[in-house]
A protein has these predicted regions:
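Mid-domain Rossmann-like dinucleotide-binding core that forms the NAD(H)/NADP(H) cofactor-binding site
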Residues: 1-47
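Short, well-ordered alpha-helical microsegments
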Residues: 7, 31, 51, 75-76, ...
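Glycine-rich phosphate-binding loop and adjacent beta-alpha segment
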Residues: 25, 73-145, 178-181
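Local beta-strand N-terminus motif with an aromatic residue
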Residues: 39, 62-63, 106, 146, ...
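Short amphipathic alpha-helix with an adjacent loop that forms part of the alpha/beta core around
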Residues: 49-60
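Short conserved AdoMet
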Residues: 58-59, 83, 170-171
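N-terminal Rossmann-like NAD(P) cofactor-binding module of classical short-chain dehydrogenase/reductase
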Residues: 66-67
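C-terminal capping/lid region of NAD(P)-dependent oxidoreductase domains
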Residues: 138, 143-152, 160-181
């Protein structure tokens, strides 16, 4: 989901920190826009498995980190393209919650699987994360080095339309609901 709000932010953060970035997206236009934003390469998910493409791109070693908002349906490809000692960070479950896992591959590659969500964290931890964002990210937002990518801004009264936009899977970046007053 390189064209999602989180994906577009990750692309910019990786570019800013001089780290390579490979994305998966829903169509060629989204891939083009991700590359324009700073992704090094990518793959249209409807074209099958991305593991071989990532391996060719990254070389035999594979990639160090996968940030995965998809979950179950990407698990096999994610594990295949990670390097020994790599980390799989699961931040969403758009592709399902349950899957079979090749535990032998996990063990042989010493892969760490990390699940992460803000929802389950205590307020004190969320506050600490916000403080870190203010210190490390806000200056880059203020300077324009990193820009939030916003597809549409709609009044909160048009929340249903916002959901339809997102469900249509043609957006690039965030859809924002604006509350006035």
């Amino acid at each position: 989901a390189g064209a999602s709000g989180v994906g577009t932010a990750a692309i910019q953060l990786l570019k800013f920190s001089h780290n390579p970035c490979f994305v998966t997206v829903g169509n060629n236009d989204k891939l083009r826009r991700c590359v324009e934003l700073g992704a090094d390469s990518g793959f249209v998910r409807h074209n099958g498995s991305f593991a071989k493409i990532v391996s060719d791109w990254a070389g035999d070693a594979g990639v160090d980190v996968v940030l995965d908002p998809v979950g179950a349906s990407y698990m096999e490809d994610n594990l295949s393209c990670l390097t020994a000692g790599g980390r799989l960070v699961i931040i969403g479950l758009l592709g399902g919650q349950k899957t079979d896992v090749n535990l032998g591959l996990l063990m042989m590659k010493r892969i760490a699987v990390i699940g992460s969500t803000l929802r389950a964290r205590p307020i004190s931890e969320k506050s600490r994360i916000m403080d870190e964002l203010k210190e490390n990210l806000w200056p880059r937002l203020e300077s324009g080095e990193i820009k939030p990518i916003i597809e549409a801004v709609l009044p909160v009264t048009e929340a249903e339309k916002a959901h339809e936009l997102i469900a249509g899977n043609e957006t690039f970046g965030k859809v924002v609901l604006e509350v006035s007053g």
